[in-house]
C-alpha cells in the first residue's frame, strides 16, 4: 500500500513539474538579436526579408521577424540553441546552424545573392519585368521608365516597341495609325472627341502597364486594323492606406501635380487619382507651295507659322470596390476631366512669282480658345464560381463629352472672322462576359457587347462686315451622327502538353445614321460582319516559344470623314467628308518567337496584313480658281481634301526586341521594326499606287549608380514614310533622365530632358498634278521637367507571382 502511494506521489510530482515548465520558460527574460540584410550586388537593403529561428529542443516553436525599409531587424527571443535562416524571395537563403545565444547579440550584416531560378517565378511590385508575353499580346510595365516621369500617356507610348507617336501626338502601331486605344480594357471618354490629343492630359505616373495586342482575340472589339493598345491605370490592392503625391515643374512653363490615394480593407477598396496640369507649349513650321499653271510660269506661296499653346486641365478619378463575399464583388467608379486651352497662331503668307519676288504679303492671327470636358461612370459586377477562373462579369459604362472651340481670325488684307465649333457626344456601353474553364487546360467563353453612341457637331463661321459679324451660311452647318454596334462573341482555348490554342468568332452588327441638318442630307448604313480569330502557341521550354496569330479587323469611318459639308481652313483650301465612304477590312497574320538566355532576351515577330477598301485621304482640285491678289492678279486653284476607298493595301514587316542585362545595375534594350507598304487603287481615272519601305528603331539604356542614383538614356529614329500623294522624311529624337531616391526611399527626385537635340521635326512633301507642297513642322520644342514623388506606406518590395490578375478588364488567356 505504501509502495503504491509513493508511486502515485512521484507520478504526481513529475506531472506537476512538466506541466509548470512551459510557464517557467515563458517567464525567462527575453534577449534580442539584430542585424542587417542587403543585396550583395547592389548593396540595397532588402525590406521584408524574413528571419526564422528554430530551437533544437522545441522545434515546433518557431520565432522570427522581418526587416524594415533599411534592411534592419531587431527580434526578441528566448536564450537557447538555434538554427537561424535568413530568406528573401528571389535570393539564396543563408542558414546559421547551432548558434548558442544567451544574451543580446548583434548577428552582423548579411549580403544575399540572387537566385536566378527562383527569380524567374516572381516579380517586384512597381519594378516588374519590363515585358511579359501572353498568347495574344505583349505587356509593357511602365514603373522603371524614368524618362517619362512628369510626362503624359503619349510620352509613355513613344517608348514602347512597335508603337510610334508623330509630332502631333497621333499614335500608330507598326506604322499603321488605325489603332484602337482602350483604357482598362474598355473604350473611354479619355479617348473621345479629341482622340489621342486627350491622352496628353493623363499623367504617365497614373499608368500601371500598357498592353499591345497585335492579334486580338474575339473578346476584343473588332475596330482597329493595326490592333489594340490597352492602357491599364494603377489601382493598389494592398491592405491598408497608401498614397503617392507627385509635383512637377519644367521649361517651357509647366506646373503639375498628382495625388493618388488608396484605402483597402478586407471587404472594401477605395481608390482615387487627382491631377492638375498647367503647360505652355511652343511650336511652329514652314509651308511652301508651288502651283502649276499649265504653260504659264508657276506661282508660289510661302507660309511661316508660330504656335503658342497653353493647356490647363484637371482630372479626378474616384472609385470603390466592394467584396460582397470571397467570390462576388461590385465596383463603381467615375471620372471627370476639364480642360481649358488657348492657342495663338501667327502666320505670315508671302505670294511669289517664278523669280522669287514677293508679290504680296499677308499677316494672319488666329486666337483660339477651347473648353474640353468629359465624364464617365462605370459599374462592374463580378461573380466567381470557383478559384479556377469560372466567372461572370457584367459591366455598364456611361460617357459624356463636350468640346467648345472658338477662334478669332484677323487678316491684314481681308475682314476679320470668327469660327465656332460645338461638339457633344454621348456613349453607352453594355458588356457581359462568361468564362468557363472546363478543366485545368481547357477554357470556353462567350459574351455580348452593346456600344451605342451619338454625336452632334455645330460649326459656325461669321465674317465681319460694317463692324458686325454676319454668319456665313455657306460655311456653317450642323451634323448629327449616330453609331450603334451590337456584338456577340465566343471562343474556345486549350493546352495540350506544350501546345496551346485559342479559337474565336465575333459577330458585329453596325447601324450608322448621318444627318446633315443644314443641307437636309440623310443617310443610313447597316452592315453585319463576322471576325474569326486564331491564336496558337508552342512552348519548347520555359525559355523558348513560338506563336502564330490570325485576326480579321474593321476600320469604320469617323464622323468628320462622312460629313458632306465643306469646312474651310483657308481661302484656297477646304475639307469635305464623303458620305459614301465604306469601312475598310483587314486580315492579319502574325508569327512570333521568344527566346531567353541567362542575360539576353530576344522577342521577334513577322507579320503580313492585307486590307481592302482602304480609307485614304487625298487632295484634289475642285476645278475652280481663287484670286488671292488684285495687283498683280494672282489666281490659285481651289483645293479640297477628302477621304476615299482605294482597292487594297499590303503590308509586310518584321520586328524584334533585344534586351541585354549583364548585371542588375545595367540593362540595354533595342527595338527595330521594318515594313513594306504597298497601296493599289484608282479614283476618278487617277492612279494612287504607292509603295514604300519604312522603318523605325529605338534603343534604351538603364544604369543603376551608387547612393540611390539611376540614369536612363533613350533614342528613337523614325524612317521615311509615304502615302499615295505624299512622302515624309525620317527624324531622330534623343531623351534622357536621372533619378535619385531621397528621404529613406520614401521620396524620389527625377529630372527628365525630352528631345535633347531639338530634332523632332516633321518634314513632308505632297505632290499632285496641280501643286507641290513642302512642310516642316515642329509640334513642341525641347522640354525639361523636374519631378518630386513622395509615397506613404508603399510596400514596393512585396512580391507576387507572375500571371496574377490585375482586374484590368483585359483578355488574359492562360491555362
Task: List each model region and its residues.
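Short, acidic Ser/Thr/Gly-rich low-complexity loop/linker segments typical of extracellular
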Residues: 56-72
Amino acid at each position: 500500500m505504501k509502495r503504491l502511494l509513493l508511486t502515485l506521489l512521484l507520478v504526481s510530482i513529475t506531472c506537476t513539474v512538466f506541466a509548470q515548465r512551459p510557464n517557467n520558460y515563458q517567464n525567462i527574460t527575453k534577449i534580442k538579436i539584430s542585424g542587417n540584410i542587403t543585396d550583395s550586388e547592389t548593396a540595397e537593403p532588402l525590406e521584408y526579408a524574413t528571419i526564422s529561428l528554430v530551437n533544437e529542443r522545441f522545434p515546433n516553436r518557431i520565432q522570427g521577424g522581418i526587416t524594415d525599409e533599411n534592411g534592419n531587424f531587431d527580434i526578441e527571443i528566448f536564450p537557447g540553441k538555434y538554427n537561424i535562416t535568413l530568406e528573401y524571395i528571389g535570393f539564396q537563403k543563408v542558414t546559421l546552424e547551432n548558434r548558442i545565444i544567451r544574451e543580446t547579440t548583434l548577428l552582423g550584416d548579411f549580403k544575399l545573392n540572387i537566385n536566378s531560378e527562383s527569380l524567374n517565378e516572381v516579380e517586384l511590385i512597381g519594378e516588374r519585368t519590363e515585358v511579359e508575353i501572353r498568347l495574344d499580346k505583349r505587356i509593357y510595365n511602365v514603373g522603371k521608365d524614368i524618362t517619362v516621369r512628369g510626362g503624359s500617356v503619349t510620352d509613355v507610348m513613344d517608348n514602347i516597341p512597335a508603337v510610334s507617336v508623330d509630332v502631333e501626338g497621333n499614335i500608330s502601331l507598326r506604322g499603321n495609325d488605325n489603332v484602337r486605344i482602350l483604357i482598362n480594357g474598355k473604350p473611354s471618354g479619355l479617348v473621345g472627341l479629341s482622340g489621342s490629343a486627350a491622352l496628353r492630359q493623363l499623367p504617365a505616373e497614373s499608368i500601371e502597364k500598357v498592353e499591345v495586342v497585335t492579334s486580338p482575340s474575339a473578346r476584343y472589339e473588332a475596330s482597329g486594323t493595326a490592333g489594340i493598345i490597352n492602357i491599364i491605370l494603377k489601382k493598389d490592392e494592398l491592405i491598408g492606406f497608401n498614397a503617392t503625391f507627385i509635383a512637377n515643374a519644367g521649361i517651357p512653363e509647366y506646373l503639375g501635380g498628382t495625388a493618388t490615394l488608396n484605402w483597402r480593407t478586407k471587404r472594401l477598396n477605395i481608390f482615387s487619382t487627382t491631377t492638375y496640369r498647367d503647360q505652355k507649349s511652343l511650336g511652329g513650321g514652314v509651308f511652301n507651295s508651288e502651283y502649276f499653271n499649265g504653260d504659264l510660269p508657276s506661282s508660289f506661296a510661302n507660309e511661316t507659322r508660330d504656335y503658342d499653346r497653353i493647356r490647363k486641365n484637371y482630372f479626378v478619378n474616384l472609385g470603390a470596390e466592394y467584396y460582397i463575399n470571397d467570390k462576388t464583388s461590385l465596383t463603381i467608379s467615375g471620372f471627370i476631366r476639364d480642360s481649358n486651352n488657348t492657342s495663338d497662331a501667327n502666320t505670315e503668307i508671302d505670294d511669289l512669282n517664278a523669280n522669287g519676288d514677293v508679290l504680296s504679303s499677308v499677316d494672319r492671327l488666329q486666337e483660339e480658345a477651347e473648353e474640353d470636358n468629359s465624364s464617365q461612370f462605370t459599374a462592374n459586377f463580378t461573380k466567381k464560381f470557383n478559384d479556377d477562373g469560372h466567372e461572370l462579369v457584367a459591366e455598364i459604362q456611361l460617357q459624356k463629352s463636350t468640346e467648345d472651340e472658338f477662334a478669332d481670325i484677323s487678316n491684314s488684307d481681308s475682314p476679320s472672322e470668327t469660327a465656332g465649333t460645338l461638339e457633344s457626344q454621348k456613349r453607352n456601353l453594355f458588356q457581359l462576359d462568361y468564362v468557363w474553364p472546363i478543366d485545368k487546360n481547357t477554357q470556353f467563353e462567350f459574351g455580348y457587347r452593346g456600344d451605342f453612341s451619338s454625336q452632334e457637331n455645330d460649326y459656325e463661321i461669321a465674317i465681319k462686315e460694317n463692324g458686325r459679324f454676319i454668319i456665313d451660311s455657306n460655311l456653317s452647318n450642323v451634323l448629327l451622327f449616330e453609331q450603334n454596334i451590337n456584338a456577340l462573341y465566343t471562343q474556345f482555348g486549350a493546352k495540350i502538353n506544350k501546345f496551346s490554342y485559342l479559337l474565336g468568332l465575333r459577330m458585329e452588327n453596325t447601324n450608322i445614321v448621318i444627318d446633315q441638318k443644314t443641307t437636309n442630307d440623310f443617310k443610313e448604313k447597316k452592315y453585319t460582319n463576322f471576325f474569326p480569330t486564331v491564336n496558337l502557341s508552342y512552348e519548347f521550354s520555359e525559355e523558348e516559344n513560338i506563336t502564330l496569330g490570325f485576326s480579321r479587323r474593321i476600320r469604320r469611318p469617323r464622323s468628320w470623314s462622312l460629313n458632306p459639308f465643306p469646312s474651310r481652313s483657308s481661302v484656297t483650301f477646304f475639307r469635305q467628308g464623303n458620305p459614301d465612304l465604306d469601312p475598310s477590312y483587314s486580315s492579319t497574320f502574325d508569327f512570333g518567337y521568344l527566346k531567353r538566355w541567362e542575360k539576353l532576351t530576344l522577342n521577334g515577330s513577322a507579320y503580313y496584313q492585307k486590307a481592302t477598301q482602304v480609307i485614304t485621304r487625298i487632295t484634289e482640285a475642285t476645278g475652280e480658281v481663287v484670286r488671292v491678289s488684285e495687283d498683280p492678279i494672282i489666281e490659285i486653284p481651289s483645293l479640297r481634301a477628302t477621304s476615299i476607298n482605294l482597292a487594297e493595301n499590303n503590308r509586310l514587316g518584321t520586328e524584334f526586341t533585344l534586351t541585354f542585362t549583364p548585371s542588375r545595375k545595367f540593362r540595354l534594350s533595342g527595338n527595330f521594326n521594318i515594313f513594306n507598304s504597298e497601296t493599289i487603287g484608282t479614283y476618278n481615272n487617277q492612279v494612287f499606287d504607292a509603295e514604300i519601305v519604312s522603318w523605325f528603331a529605338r534603343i534604351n539604356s538603364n544604369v543603376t549608380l551608387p547612393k540611390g542614383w539611376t540614369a536612363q538614356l533613350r533614342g528613337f529614329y523614325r524612317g521615311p514614310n509615304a502615302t499615295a500623294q505624299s512622302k515624309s522624311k525620317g527624324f531622330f529624337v534623343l531623351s534622357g533622365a536621372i533619378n535619385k531616391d531621397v528621404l529613406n526611399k520614401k521620396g524620389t527626385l527625377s529630372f527628365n530632358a525630352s528631345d535633347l537635340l531639338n530634332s523632332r521635326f516633321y518634314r513632308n512633301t505632297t505632290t499632285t498634278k496641280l501643286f507641290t507642297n513642302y512642310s516642316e513642322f515642329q509640334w513642341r520644342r525641347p522640354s525639361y521637367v523636374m519631378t518630386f514623388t513622395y509615397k506613404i506606406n508603399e510596400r514596393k518590395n512585396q512580391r507576387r507571382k507572375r500571371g496574377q490578375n490585375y482586374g484590368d478588364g483585359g483578355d488574359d488567356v492562360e491555362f
